[in-house]
């Protein structure tokens, strides 16, 4: 077999350490032959043997006389030292015009001997022949190639890449099996090469041609799975493309992608026919041992277990990849040989605040592919601030402000109508942020001396102008707004148009928070495109940045997640704001269904779980006792698990973060809970518990101060880890969904009686209220609640007066007397007693309904029914109940909920949440 040596590889732009820029067929020559083929390889060295194998493109090799050696067959003795040897085919179809004389071959041997010194690495004290012989097999090829057309060498004609590869089309009809037969045979012994390569110096490894992942993918399979193509991104040198599970549709897409690449770049990287043949190899089922039928999540798991890198670290992704969108299953696999080259890239990812954040950071998903193609237009930004020029007063004197200072002052002035305006914490945080904009030497030095009345009055005038607008003007404004937002409202997922949930970037303003949030009043700065990361499909057009002169922070192509965009929360940078598809999208519907199925599955295990934690109430291990008591409280009271809070976050509490002072033991076995729950809503509840639970809580409190943790041996992660041991996938949150749904299902089944639709709706609202109380879904009483109740009361009194008149007229009709005049002085037509009785019945029903509505409004004034409907109640329970009792679903679900739960509308009327 002929060999070729290179004096120095030609690098483009210093990217010589990248081997992914070479055609993939070139990398296949890196495969090491098996020991069983040693004798055959030796015999091939002694004489040239013609072959149909396609020769890879090479960098030009400069000989002493200034000519480029031919890649024709050369006779090279096995004892000849060479720093870079390459087993090449006997005849290359790329350069079929070169002479094959003995003189040329001897000249090539001379050139190879002279360039040996220039490629010596850290093993300078040893001849390469001894290293090669130590491997007990033919040496693997090592050669570096430039992806660009090569430069002239001493006046020689440049080895133009396109012209050479075009000549290769004559071999398009050659069967791939014959072209790559030797490669497949040699791939069987690739396992022994890994240990030898690990011992080689890094420089020597970098000069090798390609980085085959020998410990993960057999060489024979890689050859059959990867078509010849060019990756133009030099930054992806260390990332190997994984095997692609192709379907008949994807084969066509790949062929079209090849044609497009030829048209766009004006050069042929590979014959379309050849690429189609390589792809069809997979379709014909010739690769019996591939893993295309293995779920992608398992393949990710296998990759991470075979790699020395931590699976927790996200893999670097090059954003400007030219990969086609027709390759949905492409994965980045880092070979052992290329780990050193990816060190810097991984470090950047690790140090990023997004990857290291411990709270809601964008992850790589669960490894399951959520979509194949994704196209959207990004997000829409709020309009820029328009200055009004109104001055505020400081100690009675007008003060000039810059545009930035005026914008923030206006944010504060327009909140004069709210309670926040007078809250000390709100004013303090606002002043601290506004003072930074004003500067230390500004005339305004104290917030209390500022009078924002001029701006507030301007604000009221603007509101009044909007109210005075005609219907046509309002309609025109609305249409203009819709026209601007239309293109941002939709995404195309796998060819299906889906509505996006919230595509608007939040405008700047003053943070309010819920309850007594410690950050209320802080400035929410304006979000810019350079802070936003987008997620789209590979090959999809990158959304145009709507703000001139700016650009997106990053563009990802992660099909294991469903978010479309995210950015850091301006108030709490450890948290993120996401843009997802709408609630009615197929992806969201599937996610909801899986959530409720997981909770429903708990019905099969709940008895065993309760038996387990009851037994552990008396466990000797304190940690096990605390886990048992915490699980009991989460199960019986539907408490949230709770997470640790930073000092600058609202001091809300969950089960695992309860303090000793939040729990009071009341003999003989009652516990009073008093703490600030999620959204800073106070949770106050006194419940009767099991005697063993009462005793255990008393023991947990012993010797501790009120600010100490009640469960000092426990946190949320430990609790969830224990629950997952009992039931795979079980977390504390599943208990809330289970308890909410099972409560609704049982109450509706037990309390629904025959009656009209209105009465049945009252039964549903009562059950919904019970769920809301269990989940502590509270709300503050509306400011207009009192006025609404007064209005209803007055209306009921009016109806009762009318009822009295009707009853009086009924009595007069029975006596044959004419009816009395109405309260408005008008005469009333005489009617038969039956007609008066009918009017009385209608009026009584109207009064009864209004009284029922008023009672419900008063009863639910502090209870939020919507939260449990949206997040915790299996919608199939409601839909099935409505079908069984002939209640229109529109009476229970709003229009938005009907869209969100479209997947549940086909449920059978007999559906029950409990499978028992």
UniProtKB/Swiss-Prot annotation:
Residues modified to Phosphothreonine: 286
Sequence segments annotated as region (Interaction with DNA): 577-578, 640-645, 731-733
Main localization category: nucleus
Compositional bias annotation for Acidic residues: 285-294
UniProtKB keywords: Coiled coil, DNA-binding, Isomerase, Nucleus, Phosphoprotein, Topoisomerase
Residues where Phosphoserine is found: 170
Mutant lacking the gene: phenotype: Defects in phyllotaxis and plant architecture. Morphological abnormalities of several organs. Defects in cellular development and organization of both the shoot and the root meristem.
Annotated spans, Disordered: 1-369
Biased composition (Basic and acidic residues): 102-119, 149-168, 253-267
MF-aspect GO terms: DNA binding; DNA topoisomerase type I (single strand cut, ATP-independent) activity
Lineage: superkingdom: Eukaryota
Catalytic center residues: 872
UniProt miscellaneous comment: Eukaryotic topoisomerase I and II can relax both negative and positive supercoils, whereas prokaryotic enzymes relax only negative supercoils.
Role according to the record: Releases the supercoiling and torsional tension of DNA introduced during the DNA replication and transcription by transiently cleaving and rejoining one strand of the DNA duplex. Introduces a single-strand break via transesterification at a target site in duplex DNA. The scissile phosphodiester is attacked by the catalytic tyrosine of the enzyme, resulting in the formation of a DNA-(3'-phosphotyrosyl)-enzyme intermediate and the expulsion of a 5'-OH DNA strand. The free DNA strand then rotates around the intact phosphodiester bond on the opposing strand, thus removing DNA supercoils.
Family statement: Belongs to the type IB topoisomerase family.
Protein name in UniProt: DNA topoisomerase 1 alpha
Organism: Arabidopsis thaliana (Mouse-ear cress)
Lineage, broadest ranks: Eukaryota, Viridiplantae, Streptophyta, Embryophyta, Tracheophyta
GN (gene name): TOP1A
């Amino acid at each position: 077999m002929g060999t070729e040596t290179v004096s120095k590889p030609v690098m483009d732009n210093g990217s010589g350490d990248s081997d992914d820029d070479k055609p993939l067929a070139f990398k296949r020559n890196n495969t090491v032959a098996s020991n069983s083929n040693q004798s055959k390889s030796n015999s091939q060295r002694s004489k040239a043997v013609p072959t149909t194998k396609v020769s890879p493109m090479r960098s030009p090799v400069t000989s002493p006389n200034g000519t480029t050696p031919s890649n024709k067959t050369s006779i090279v003795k096995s004892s000849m030292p060479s720093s870079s040897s390459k087993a090449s085919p006997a005849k290359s179809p790329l350069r079929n015009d070169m002479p094959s004389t003995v003189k040329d071959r001897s000249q090539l041997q001379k050139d190879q001997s002279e360039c040996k010194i220039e490629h010596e690495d850290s093993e300078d004290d040893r001849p390469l022949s001894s290293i090669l012989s130590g491997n007990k097999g033919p040496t693997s090829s090592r050669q570096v190639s430039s992806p660009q057309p090569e430069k002239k060498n001493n006046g020689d004609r440049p080895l133009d890449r396109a012209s050479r590869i075009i000549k290769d089309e004559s071999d398009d009809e050659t069967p791939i099996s014959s072209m790559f037969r030797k490669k497949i045979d040699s791939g069987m012994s690739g396992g022994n090469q890994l240990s030898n390569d690990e011992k080689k110096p890094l420089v020597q490894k970098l000069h090798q041609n390609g980085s085959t992942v020998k410990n993960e993918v057999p060489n024979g399979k890689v050859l059959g799975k990867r078509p010849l193509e060019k990756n133009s991104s030099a930054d992806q040198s260390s990332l190997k493309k994984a095997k692609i599970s192709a379907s008949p549709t994807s084969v066509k897409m790949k062929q079209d992608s090849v044609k497009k690449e030829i048209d766009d770049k004006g050069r042929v990287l590979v014959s379309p026919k050849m690429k189609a043949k390589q792809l069809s190899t997979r379709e014909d089922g010739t690769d019996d041992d591939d893993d295309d039928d293995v779920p992608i999540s398992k393949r990710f798991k296998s990759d991470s277990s075979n790699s020395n890198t931590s699976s927790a670290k996200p893999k670097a992704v090059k954003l400007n990849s030219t990969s086609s969108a027709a390759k949905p299953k492409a994965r980045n696999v880092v070979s052992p040989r290329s780990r050193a080259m990816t060190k810097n890239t991984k470090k950047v990812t690790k140090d990023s605040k997004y990857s290291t954040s411990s709270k809601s950071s964008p992850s790589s998903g669960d490894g399951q592919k959520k979509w194949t193609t994704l196209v959207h237009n990004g997000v829409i930004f709020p309009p820029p601030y328009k200055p009004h020029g109104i001055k505020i007063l400081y100690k009675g004197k007008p003060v000039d402000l810059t545009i930035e200072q005026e914008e923030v002052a206006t944010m504060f002035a327009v909140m004069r109508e709210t309670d926040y305006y007078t809250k000390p914490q709100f004013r303090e945080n606002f002043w601290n942020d506004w003072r930074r904009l004003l500067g230390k030497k500004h005339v305004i030095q104290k917030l209390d001396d500022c009078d924002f009345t001029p701006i507030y009055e301007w604000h009221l005038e603007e509101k009044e102008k909007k109210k005075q607008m005609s219907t046509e003007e309002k309609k025109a404004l609305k249409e203009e707004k819709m026209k601007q937002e239309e293109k941002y409202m939709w995404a195309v997922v796998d060819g299906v148009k889906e509505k996006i949930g919230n595509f608007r970037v939040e405008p700047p303003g003053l943070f309010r928070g819920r309850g007594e949030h410690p950050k209320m009043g802080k400035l929410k700065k304006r979000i810019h495109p350079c802070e936003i990361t987008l997620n789209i499909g590979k090959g999809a057009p990158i959304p145009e940045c709507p703000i001139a002169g700016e650009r997106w922070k990053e563009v990802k192509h992660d099909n294991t997640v469903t978010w479309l965009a995210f950015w850091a929360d301006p108030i709490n940078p450890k948290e993120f704001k996401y843009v997802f598809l709408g609630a009615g999208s197929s992806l969201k519907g599937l996610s909801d269904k899986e959530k409720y199925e997981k909770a429903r599955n708990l019905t099969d295990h709940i008895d065993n779980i309760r038996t387990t934690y009851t037994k552990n109430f008396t466990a000797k291990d304190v940690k096990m006792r605390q886990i048992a008591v915490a699980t009991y409280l989460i199960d019986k009271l539907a408490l949230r698990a709770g997470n640790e809070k930073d000092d600058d976050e609202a001091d809300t509490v969950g089960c695992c973060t309860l303090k000793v002072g939040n729990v009071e033991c009341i003999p003989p076995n009652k516990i009073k809970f008093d703490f600030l729950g999620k959204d800073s809503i106070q949770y106050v509840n006194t419940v009767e518990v099991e005697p063993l639970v009462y005793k255990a809580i008393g023991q947990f409190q012993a010797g501790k101060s009120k600010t100490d943790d009640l469960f000092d041996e426990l946190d949320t992660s430990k609790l969830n880890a224990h629950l997952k041991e009992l039931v795979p996938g079980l977390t504390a949150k599943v208990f809330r969904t289970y308890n909410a749904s099972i409560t609704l299902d049982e109450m509706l089944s037990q309390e629904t009686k025959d009656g009209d639709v209105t009465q049945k709706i009252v039964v549903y609202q009562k059950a919904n209220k019970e769920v809301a109380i269990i989940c502590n879904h509270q709300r503050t009483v509306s400011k207009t609640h009192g006025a609404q109740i007064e209005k209803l009361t007055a209306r009921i009194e009016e109806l009762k007066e009318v009822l009295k008149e009707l009853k009086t007229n009924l009595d007069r009709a029975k006596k044959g007397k004419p009816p009395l005049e109405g309260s408005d002085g008008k005469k009333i037509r005489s009617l038969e007693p039956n007609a008066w009785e009918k009017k009385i019945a209608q009026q009584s029903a109207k009064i009864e309904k209004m009284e029922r509505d008023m009672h419900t409004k008063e009863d639910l004034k502090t209870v939020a029914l919507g939260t449990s409907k949206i997040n915790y109640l299996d919608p199939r329970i409601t839909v099935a109940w409505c079908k069984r009792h002939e209640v229109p679903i529109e009476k229970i679900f709003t229009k938005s909920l009907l869209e969100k739960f479209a997947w549940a509308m086909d449920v059978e009327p007999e559906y029950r949440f409990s499978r028992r």
